[in-house]
Amino acid sequence: MSGLGENSLDPLASETRKRKPSSCDTPGPGLTCSGEKRRREQESKYIEELADLISANLSDIDNFNVKPDKCAILKETVRQIRQIKEQGKASSNDDDVQKADVSSTGQGVIDKDSLGPLLLQALDGFLYVVNREGSIVFVSENVTQYLQYKQEDLVNTSVYSILHEEDRKDFLKNLPKSTVNGVPWFSETPRQKSHTFNCRMLVKTSHDHLEDGSNLDARQRYETMQCFALSQPRAMIEEGEDLQSCMICVARRITTAERAFSANPESFITRHDLTGKVVNIDANSLRSSMRPGFEDTIRRCIQRFLFHSEGQPWTYKRHYQEAYVHGLSETPLYRFSLADGTMVTAQTKSKLFRNPVTNDPHGFVSTHFLQREQNGYRPNPNPMAQGIRPQMNPNLPNTMNSMPPQAMQQQNRNYGMGDPNSMAQMQGMRYKSPGNMAPVNQAPGVQQSPYQNNSNYGLNMNSPPHGSPGMNANQPNLMVSPRNRASPKMASNQFSPVPGMNSPMGSSGNAGGGSFSSSSLSALHAISEGVGSSLLSSLSSPGQKVENNSNMNMPQQGKICNQDCKSPSGLYCEQGQVESSVCQSSGREHLGEKDVKENIFEGSESQRSQAESKGHKKLLQLLTCFTEERGQSLMSSSSMDCKDSSNVTSPSGVSSSTSIGVSSTSNLHGSMLQEKHRILHKLLQNGNSPAEVAKITAEATGKDVFQETVSSAPCTEATVKREQLSPKKKENNALLRHLLDKDDWKDPLAKDIKPKVEHMDIKMGSCSSSNVPTSSQDKEVKIKTEPGEEVPGDLDNLDAILGDLAGSDFYSNSMSSRASDLGPKQPVFQDSPTLAMRSPDSMQGSRPPFNRAMSLDSRSSTPPVRNVNSFPMLPKQGMIGSPRMMDGQDNFGVMMGSGPNRSMNQHPGGDWAMQNSAVNRLEPPNVGSVGRPGPDYSSAMTRPAMGGNMPGLLTRSNSIPGSRPVMQQQQHILPMRPNDMAMSMGSNPYGQQAPSNPPGSWPDAIMMNQGRGGAQNRQLGRNSLDDLLCPPSTVEGQTDEIALLDQLHTLLSNTDATGLEEIDRALGIPDLVSQGQALEPQPDSYQPQGSPVMIDQKPPMYGQHYAGQGAAMSAGGFNNMQGQHPPFNTVMGQMNQQQGMHPLQGMHPRANLIRPRNNIPKQLRMQLQQRLQGQQFLNQNRQALEMKVDPMNPGGAGVMRPVMQTPVSQQGFLNAQMVAQKNRELISHQIRQHRMAMMMQQQQGQPQAFSPPPNVTASASMDNPLGGPPMPQAPPQQFSYPPNYGINQQTDPTFGRVSSPPNAMMSSRMAPSQNPHPQTTQMYPSPDMKGWPSGNMARPNSFPQQQYSHQTNPATYNMMHMNGNGNHMGQMNINSLPMSGMPMGPDQKYC
């Protein structure tokens, strides 16, 4: 009020009164007005000052919501003055306590100097003032308590020097803007501005970063402070400074509790489409929280929300369903951990977002609220919580098998635990390590993958159908396949010889062949990944031979020593024999076979390597393949070899210990085998040349070496390049032993054969059965056979050498109950996908018939029919290619009879059941190799990328062009062999429908595929072994081979374990084994032919049901769609097309499945994956199609109805999809067979050329299935059926399943079927099949077949549906539409 001077309120009033009249009376109104204006301005100024003096109540004045007027200010001033006076009067009566500085009743206003510190103490913070430039104008002294800085250290410094760099931008936003913009105070809101924000301030350390700039990041520590900022009005001036341009802040610590549970939790927003798929992520809010690692937080939160809510009371799907219905939804609280172990509690709230225009639901907007828990940064003791997948077996690669059995079992996901095979593996564990794992100490070279420890996704390797070829922990590289069968990755070790490990053979052995199909698939998978050989561990003892599982083809790191498992691993053990470990000999046998096949494949790559490899292959194959005893011998020998073989991963990847069932038998037989092997080794060690050894062996045994020698003889020089595995030599021994296993080397001629091994160190083992086309280039084995006596081309000799594969364990169907009949014989191939895939048998199966789709010679050498068990699948392909198969192969058509060794591995019982899991869908490899042997053995032998060697696979040869889907379907089809389709049909699902490929019925069809043309007609008299082994160009050469084999036998018999081991090394068997693993199938060589073989084998299952259809079914039974031959008749179709003259009539359409050979394991994997996916799609699509097909064929009412028997429960281990597919295949095959039988009768005079039904337009794909030549009308086959029987005849769509009554579906659509007679009634191949409910088949198949999954609509299985296949549907009424030209879709493949 001092500004008023002596004036008082009254004078002001009187002055005002005077002013008014003067303004009116004064003649100079302008002058008077100006004076009044000045006074008013002065008055307003004083009133503003007065208002400032009562600023304590400024907030009350602000409540006026208007600029305070003079009256209000004056009134408030008077009130406060009175209040002060009253307080002063009362204070005189108060005691000292009331006069304390802290008392609110103290005289006057609290002293500024004392008020500030008190307030700061109460707030637990410090005060600082920052100007608009960010310079600290003032800071309270207690800042030292918080930041360790002194007041003078911070004043006049930049606040940004103590702020975290990530907080500086936000801090700048909080600085006063009015001052910065120069906006006058009154233009702003009259209220004071305040806000709260958090920032991180640097705490001074002993060595301040301002003093020392080194290692600042390591030393800097920040304190999170909560700042309350206030911007003062412009009128507030102190000491000449305009505080309006400053921000006054009080900073206080944030407590741990507040930090952990902030009032405002972190959050981020995601946008989802109506299916719940993430469309957009808005992380701005988290990013602004300035917390490091917010990206990881978001990722983990979304993973937890979307992918780990299954099995919880809530799922994101339910959450969004609720949001869709109610518009809003929120999840319960869920938790996840960050990388540093901090636990975060989260909750998601979602809102349905609608299109503002149409109001249609557009998607969901989800806000995820995150709350970090206290003690936030604790290390996560459980890396698994972080999604870190600890290595299943932390042990060194050498200790891969070190896991305790229980651990192995735990890790082994034995989906097929019920399977004897899976049990076998578990039993195998008893052989020292869990899961037949080799002793804890693996060879140092063995690498253990985190998943090696029997992480069998499918079954343990042991499980017959599911168990991959003994995939166990040792197979780090095995691809884990979702399939029920243990995929190659299922048991990490599945191929390794380690006892617990399921070596390809081992697991198959464990599976007793039952696991073979899965094993084959697994091996196939492993091969595709190159996993097989690595399983082999260096053998602790020479006796222990780690036979590289070709199938495993795992890196040598995967090598596993089964030494610890002394018990023989009867590789060939039946499922029943799962307990006994697999015999090395069988492993060797498989190795030999696989090696041969692999060599053959290589041969396709190069004539030189092919010739050389053929020589070794012959030798190995002789050693491994001969005698039906093989399974039994293997079983028995496995015991002897057990120490070796159990430790040894057979070339087939069989761990002798892996087979559990045959320990006793293996021991007996193994003893003899071991003796022989020892002889051979001793001879070799003594410096005897291979020729000498062969002679000695022949002399010792008094037997001809083998016709295999004959086969090998033609390949005068075979250079087998294989990766050298330390255990290969031992594996070589295994092969030799396996050969020796066959006590009855029957070809005296072998004595005369003088093979020369230019490189003894080449490891025969390289011929390991691993399908992986790993060529062991480490060494080259050059075997020169000097012709001795002419070896009779008699297939019988080969049979003697290789043994009747049908009778042999190889043929035993692990899946089928018959496996027991075969006993240990079959297990080798069955159990070991590796064997199946790359086992010499497989190789043979695929290669031996140069022109034959299935390399009947190799597997077919042993008449598949002979096999009591329906050949599960290709596992016996090699067997099919074996001499007996060859016998049947005098004409490929005979293949059905003697060697429907097509990849189909015909089960004489008419079972298409895959021999093992290998044969099962999961195992295309053998099939591929077998099914699509190239024009020459080498090409035929070339392993399909998928592991065409796998006997159980109907894989079309890699070389055969074709749509991948077709390959895949074919592969699936192969796995779906009747056993597969029959689904564990121990006996032929169709009940020996056809005599299981009468010898005459298959040959042409099979040959067609193989022949691609006339090639299919390649000399029927050729021994399958010759074909497999690269048959000697001359009889003399064959004789030399036989002599050589005999000599080898003698040598091996006389050699001790060490000597045998040395011999193996000298022979380069280990190299061969690894090479076999490395060998990649030559796509060109097999191209269409491999598939046909696969198909051929399967037909046997169906052949029985339809009289005369055995061959027809084999050849054409599954040919159903000429264009579509891929599905079942693919091989046939291709063969027909390729050969143009030999429809694979004897072969099932599968035989025609020609999988293009993919040298790349990638193809194998792709095929496996496609199978799995394709099966699913096929199941879905086929079901839909089946439903459609029924109406399609009203005219052919019975056309599509499959007479499929419900698959035997054996396939319980198969995936439901696989089972369903197999069932469909069975149905389709039966239908086709039935139709084919009728059609053959009708069409015997008809040309083979494919012609879609009049009412059906063939799809382009039908024109060229699998990219293979369209099915040409083949000249009349050796079969009784017309050449185009099963090709042109309107068989069921290859794999078309009949959802509804086949007739109805097919006939309506295909009413004008080309078949002279509708297959309607024929459609129902058998009452069994009729019994199949369209929706569900009694078969263990988890997947109900669509109605009459048999509906032959190839479309059903072919993605062609009624369209592509429908074109043929007319034909398909009962006969599968001639879809040979149609490539099979991946779905079809599964049929």
UniProtKB/Swiss-Prot annotation:
Cite the residue spans of the region called Acetyltransferase.
1088-1274
Indicate whether Glycosyltransferase appears among the record's keywords: no
Effect in UniProt of substituting residue 739 to A:
Strongly impairs interaction with nuclear receptors
Give Gene Ontology CC terms.
cytoplasm; nucleus
Tell me the keywords, alphabetical order.
Acetylation, Activator, Acyltransferase, Cytoplasm, Nucleus, Phosphoprotein, Repeat, Transcription, Transcription regulation, Transferase
User: What the entry says about post-translational processing?
Assistant: Phosphorylated and acetylated.
Where is the motif named LXXLL motif 2 mapped on this chain?
A: 736-740
What is the name listed in the Swiss-Prot or TrEMBL entry for this protein?
Answer: Nuclear receptor coactivator 3
Q: Which organism is it from?
A: Xenopus laevis
